[in-house]
């Protein structure tokens, strides 16, 4: 039957969980390992417990900081899918690189990684277009507020955008200008700079350990 509960890592973004709660899903938060990924044994045990209690769980796993799952977690996720448990992966931190996570659905919010007002997506095997609403004044105001925040980063502009976002839970197409900005963004160069920063950070850590 339709899923009615969600298994998530403790270390995850609440904005990815709230929509499920608004749909009435019961949320089970599980511990993560040293790599911030779901603990594989805890996940397997939680899924078994959900089934014993008559729940129909789904799994939301997150590639936090771009970290990929361990081979053990990959096997647990594969088994979950074989058992008919939907697996959703939050690739907000990792969409610039390939993913090892076996999943049915991919969700990404680009503005958490890129200096853009919006553009997010849900990628799935089935057609989800009927779930997309129509932009209205609330969405226009939110886009404008996010632009003001990007130009003038402060608590006031941040709170203005976040307060408007609280009233905009229905997915709608992105603003045309925001879409054009994303399509024109040099993702390859940005990815190169991320790798460069990562290498510099790791090098600094090695020096600090000596």
Report the location of each language-model feature:
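Conserved PLP-anchoring active-site segment centered on the Schiff-base-forming lysine
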Residues: 1-50
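Residues within well-ordered alpha-helices
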Residues: 16-18, 76, 201
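A generic structural signal for well-ordered alpha-helical segments
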Residues: 20, 78-81, 205
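Pyridoxal 5′-phosphate
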Residues: 25, 55-56, 173
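Active-site phosphate-binding strand-loop segment of PLP-dependent enzymes
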Residues: 36-130
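PLP-dependent aminotransferase class I/II
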Residues: 60, 129-210
């Amino acid at each position: 039957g339709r899923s009615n509960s969600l298994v998530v890592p403790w270390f995850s973004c609440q904005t990815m969980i709230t929509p499920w709660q608004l749909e009435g899903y019961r949320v089970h938060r599980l511990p993560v390992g040293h790599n911030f990924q779901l603990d594989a044994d805890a996940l397997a045990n939680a899924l078994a417990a959900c089934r014993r209690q008559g729940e129909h769980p789904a799994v939301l796993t997150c590639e936090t900081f771009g970290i990929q799952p361990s081979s053990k977690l990959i096997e647990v996720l594969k088994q979950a899918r074989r058992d008919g448990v939907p697996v959703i992966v939050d690739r907000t931190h990792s969409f610039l690189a390939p993913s090892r996570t076996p999943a049915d659905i991919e969700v990404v919010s680009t503005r958490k990684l890129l200096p853009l007002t919006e553009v997010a997506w849900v990628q799935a095997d089935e057609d989800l277009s009927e779930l997309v609403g129509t932009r209205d004044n609330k969405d226009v105001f939110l886009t404008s507020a996010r632009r003001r925040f990007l130009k003038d980063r402060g608590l006031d502009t941040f709170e203005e955008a976040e307060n408007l976002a609280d009233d905009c839970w229905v997915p709608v197409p992105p603003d045309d200008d925001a879409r054009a900005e994303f399509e024109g963004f040099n993702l390859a160069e940005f990815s190169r700079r991320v790798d460069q920063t990562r290498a510099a950070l790791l090098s600094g850590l090695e020096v600090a350990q000596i």
